[in-house]
């Protein structure tokens, strides 16, 4: 990247940070205070192409009334779509939408449904990690054409963090900083990964597994069901099952037998790793090993109590949102 690009990135962040104090005040407002803000949030549908595959992109932000807002792109995991998981509306319960929360913080928030998820094309592919990386490569030029920003911030959840890690290795010029949440490095000794490894014959026998409401209930019951409101898997199932009743197996296969896929030494940007108190997809030892190898010293590792694997949909989601917001708004380094 050129020094001109670096200067422009620093300038955008400085302009954004000038409003950080106001953002924090808004974030601390009581729940009822956000209703008007939610009504003002602008939502847009966009599309990308990966050959014959149509990829659905979804954007939410506050109305434009100043300099460009920093772009935050959210990468979903193995079991539900981007819009379904990151913009979830839970009847009778406010503030479950990750996208709304960060739009209120001042971000231009994007996500996508990977191939065979949500509103994107339904094909016969198993939608493995490699497929998801190619999805991101198709999506980011669309984001750039709409926002004018080539280099953006990212969040990846579970297998989405693996997709994101591979993408960052291959297209580092597009990644400003990123959060790897519920990441798996090797999976050795992790209960959920060992379960998938033992079930590999079934996972490779078909590119898909059937999905039902019980599938979504099981995701949230797996690690610690006390960390989630039962209304959440019900709302998620209601959304997802209107779009498809199958889930591709590719990422499960990769996580069972193809780890590691991300080389920490090749991640050049600033990285924050977030680790739930209850998460069977990795061990502390493997994640700390990965973290120790990250070359950029502007890095963070945060283990959070009161949350499980899908922390951003847990009762204590506000705690991981706080960590991410602080990381994404970290002031730029001053010269001596």
Regions found by a protein language model. Give the residues of each.
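N-terminal secretory signal peptides
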Residues: 1-11, 22
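N-terminal export signals
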Residues: 15-35
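N-terminal cap/lid segment of alpha/beta-hydrolase-fold proteins
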Residues: 36-64
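Short, surface-exposed "cap/lid" segments of acyl-processing enzymes
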Residues: 66-68, 72-104
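Conserved acidic catalytic loop of the alpha/beta-hydrolase fold
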Residues: 134-150
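Alpha/beta-hydrolase
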Residues: 192-274
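Conserved alpha/beta-hydrolase "acid-adjacent" motif
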Residues: 280-286
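Catalytic histidine-centered segment of alpha/beta-hydrolase-like enzymes
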Residues: 307-317
């Amino acid at each position: 990247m050129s020094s001109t690009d670096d200067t422009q990135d620093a300038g955008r962040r400085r302009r954004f940070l000038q409003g950080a104090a106001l953002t924090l005040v808004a974030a601390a407002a009581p729940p009822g205070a956000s209703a008007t803000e939610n009504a003002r949030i602008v939502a847009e549908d966009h599309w990308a192409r990966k050959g014959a595959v149509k990829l659905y992109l979804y954007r939410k932000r506050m109305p434009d009334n100043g300099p460009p807002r920093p772009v935050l792109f959210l990468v979903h995991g193995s079991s539900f779509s981007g819009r379904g998981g990151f913009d979830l509306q839970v009847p009778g319960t406010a503030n479950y939408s990750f996208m709304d929360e960060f739009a209120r913080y001042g971000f231009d928030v994007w996500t996508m449904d990977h191939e065979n998820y949500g509103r994107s094309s339904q094909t016969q592919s198993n939608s493995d990690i490699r497929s998801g990386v190619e999805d991101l490569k198709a999506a980011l030029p669309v984001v750039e054409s709409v926002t004018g920003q080539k280099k953006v911030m990212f969040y990846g959840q579970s297998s989405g963090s693996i997709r994101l890690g591979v993408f960052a290795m291959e297209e580092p010029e597009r990644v400003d900083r990123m959060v790897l949440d519920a990441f798996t490095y090797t999976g050795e000794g992790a209960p959920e990964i060992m379960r998938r490894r033992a079930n590999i014959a079934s996972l490779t026998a078909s590119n898909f597994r059937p999905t039902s409401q019980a599938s979504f209930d099981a995701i949230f019951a797996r690690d610690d069901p006390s960390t989630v409101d039962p209304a959440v898997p019900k709302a998620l199932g209601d959304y997802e099952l209107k779009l498809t009743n199958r889930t591709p197996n590719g990422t499960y296969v990769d996580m069972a037998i193809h780890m590691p896929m991300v080389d920490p030494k090749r991640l050049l940007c600033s990285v924050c790793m977030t680790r739930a108190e209850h998460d069977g997809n990795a061990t502390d030892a493997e994640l700390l090993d990965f973290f120790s190898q990250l070359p950029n010293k502007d890095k963070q590792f945060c283990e959070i109590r009161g949350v499980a694997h899908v922390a951003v949909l847990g009762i204590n989601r506000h705690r991981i949102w706080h960590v991410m917001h602080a990381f994404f708004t970290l002031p730029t380094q001053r010269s001596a």
